[in-house]
Structure formats: structure tokens, C-alpha cells
């Protein structure tokens, strides 16, 4: 886990510096990297690891409970934002989405491999593809459209995009019906190397994005630690995993990778939603920054304990 923490710090720093020196070109690089991860790396990782996944009751029920836990966490965030902190809808909407949206793709899969071992990567991929992504494309977009100041896309368009513009999900579907012969050990091992590359490339793009936001005046770096930032940290680090564990404990033996994924920091795409739908962009960027800064040292300690 130490190398992941160092890689994240180095990659974010490199991304910030790249944006300072290359300007708009760095933004093009960052978006290209994210597309490469989405359309090439993650589908390969998903296919070769899901093909080896044993789908039992714990995994199947865990997926449903994962959806439920994220929705409940988002509801907690919304209620705290509106009733306790008295936040405007665009800000409270971000807080709800933070409760809903974790960084399980760029960070979660690699962390699962580093802390739990590569035998758990298939479970981490399953959580990302079958729990987090459906919630993002449906739930997060719906909250953004309902609370933002700009008109959004229609629900049918979002659902259609979820199925036809979601390469990792397609890879998961193919892997579930593929024979084991299509996922030989050598390719599974190669996919583990790709997993280790994801944080390096992904957080370079994060660094570029944060630098762009700071340059445009949307946020300061590091962002101020406000009450809503504190709630965001609690939602991602404590509430989400606690709700999932509480729901699962009476019924199943929750896969370790599912619980670990629930603790991941806020996802980068929250900033994208904030821009598109007119949500609170500085808060969105700040929530991503702070939840990541808090999560990394905690996960580092966990890797030593485990």
C-alpha cells in the first residue's frame, strides 16, 4: 500500500506541474488518459478477473446491499446538508453524491490488490462494475439533475448510455459467460500489472483537473476544511462502510473487497457532474481532495495491520 500512497502523491504533483507548464494540452492528456483507462485498461482488468470470480450468495446479495447502502448514505448526506447545515440545493446535492460516489475504479481495485491480495481483485472489479457504476450513471446523475442549476439529460438517455457506453460493464457481462480457458493464468497475472498502473495514470489526470479548477478560480489548493467537507469525509470513510456492514452482517459473509470499496474517497467524476449540472464546483473538488487525503494514510495503516 505504501507504493500506492507514494504513487498517488507523485502522480497528483506531476499532473499539477504538467497543467502549469503545458496548460490546455495537459487537459487534453488528462482526458485522453481517463478514456484510455475506461475503454482499454478497465475492460481488460474486468474481463480476466471476473472470469475467475465465483458468484455465490455472498457476492450476489452483497451487490444488492451495496446499492442500498450507497442510497442510504446519500440520503444521510442530503438530510445533513439541508436540515443541519442549511446548505443550498446545489451544495447539498454534491454532499449527497459524495455519499453515493466512491473512487472504486481509479483507486479501489488497486487498493484491494495491495491490501487484500490479488485474489480479491475480481470482487473489487465486481463492486465497481455492478454496484458503483450503476449507482453513478443513474443515481448520481439523477441527484445532479434534480439539484443543479442547469438542465440535464433525460433519464432514458442516461440509462441507454449506461448500457452502451460502459465498456467495463460489457466486459463483466462477457466474462460471466466466458469459459475459464479464455482467462489463462498468464493473462490474469498481466491484468494485475494493469491494475497497478491505474492509480499512477488516473491520479495524474486528477492532478491536472485540480490544477485547472484552481487556475479558473473554482477552488483553492488545498481547499479550506469547512463543515460540509468534514461531513463528506465522514460519509465516505465511516457512514458508507458502516451502513453496508450493518445491512450485511445479519444475512451474509460480506466480501472483504466490498467493504474496502465502500471506504474509498469521493470519485473524480463528481466534479464533472458539478460542471454539467450547475452544482457547487469548489465544494465538489474540495470533497474529492480532502476525502482522498484522509483515506490514503488510513489505508496505509490498514495495510500494515492486515
Which residues does each predicted region cover?
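Alpha-helical transmembrane segments of multi-pass small-molecule/ion transporters
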Residues: 1-306
Amino acid at each position: 500500500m505504501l507504493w500506492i500512497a507514494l504513487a498517488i502523491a507523485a502522480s497528483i504533483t506531476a499532473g499539477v506541474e504538467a497543467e502549469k507548464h503545458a496548460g490546455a494540452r495537459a487537459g487534453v492528456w488528462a482526458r485522453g488518459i481517463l478514456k484510455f483507462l475506461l475503454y482499454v485498461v478497465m475492460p481488460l482488468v474486468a474481463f480476466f478477473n471476473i472470469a475467475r470470480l465465483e458468484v455465490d450468495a455472498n457476492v450476489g446479495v452483497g451487490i444488492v446491499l451495496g446499492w442500498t447502502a450507497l442510497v442510504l448514505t446519500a440520503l444521510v448526506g442530503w438530510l445533513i446538508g439541508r436540515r443541519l447545515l442549511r446548505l443550498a440545493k446545489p451544495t447539498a446535492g454534491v454532499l449527497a453524491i459524495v455519499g453515493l460516489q466512491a473512487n472504486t475504479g481509479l483507486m479501489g481495485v488497486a487498493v484491494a490488490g495491495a491490501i487484500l491480495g490479488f485474489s480479491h481483485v475480481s470482487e473489487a472489479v465486481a463492486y465497481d462494475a455492478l454496484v458503483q457504476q450503476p449507482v453513478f450513471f443513474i443515481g448520481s446523475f439523477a441527484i445532479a439533475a434534480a439539484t443543479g442549476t442547469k438542465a440535464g439529460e433525460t433519464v432514458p438517455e442516461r440509462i441507454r448510455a449506461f448500457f452502451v457506453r460502459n465498456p467495463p460493464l460489457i466486459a463483466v457481462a462477457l466474462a460471466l459467460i466466458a469459459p475459464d480457458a479464455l482467462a489463462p493464468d498468464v493473462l490474469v497475472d498481466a491484468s494485475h500489472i494493469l491494475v497497478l498502473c491505474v492509480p499512477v495514470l488516473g491520479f495524474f489526470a486528477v492532478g491536472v483537473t485540480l490544477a485547472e479548477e484552481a487556475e479558473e478560480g473554482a477552488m483553492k489548493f488545498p481547499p479550506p476544511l469547512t463543515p460540509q467537507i468534514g461531513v463528506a469525509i465522514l460519509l465516505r470513510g465511516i457512514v458508507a462502510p458502516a451502513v453496508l456492514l450493518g445491512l450485511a452482517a445479519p444475512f451474509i459473509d460480506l466480501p472483504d473487497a466490498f467493504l474496502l470499496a465502500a471506504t474509498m474517497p469521493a470519485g473524480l467524476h463528481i466534479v464533472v457532474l458539478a460542471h454539467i449540472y450547475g452544482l457547487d464546483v469548489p465544494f465538489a473538488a474540495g470533497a474529492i481532495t480532502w476525502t482522498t487525503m484522509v483515506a490514503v494514510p488510513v489505508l496505509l495503516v490498514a495495510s500494515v495491520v492486515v
